[in-house]
Amino acid sequence: MKQLGRPTSDVLAVTMPCFGTTRRTRSNAEILCDELAVSFTEIDIANTVHSHFKDIGQDEQVLDVTFENGQARVRTLELMDTANRTGGLVVGTGDLSELALGWATYNGDHMSMYGVNAGVPKTLVRHLVRYEADIAASAELRRVLL
């Protein structure tokens, strides 16, 4: 954001809890956003996913690929519409390995307006996170990253 001359608060981080989202995941997201001084919001997608599963006849007790992919696709819908509403763009988190090997949900987490990690193999992601943790501005940010 510095290179764009924009405040970090112009970044809107979105957490979208649903089935299986833990308190730790939510807490780490909040801490990360606070430490980086980016805006943070929550969109609880559980009701939307329940409605979607009802529409398609998906039994929520069947933890299959439809159960997993349905959540990813709802998240992408929410992100794309939030980006449209706010004049932003969706920055994807998928890496080169996930994209090359198909370890992403079509019309789900493989879609974004900018795939910042699209050229980064999974084997390098851990090293990049470690590097950022090593230069982190605070001990709390370092803790969350590691």
Residue ranges of model-derived segments:
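Nucleotide-activated chemistry modules centered on ATP-dependent adenylation/adenylyltransferase
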Residues: 50-62, 69-146
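A conserved segment at the C-terminal end of the G1
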Residues: 1
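A conserved beta-strand->alpha-helix junction
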Residues: 4-66, 72, 98, 144-146
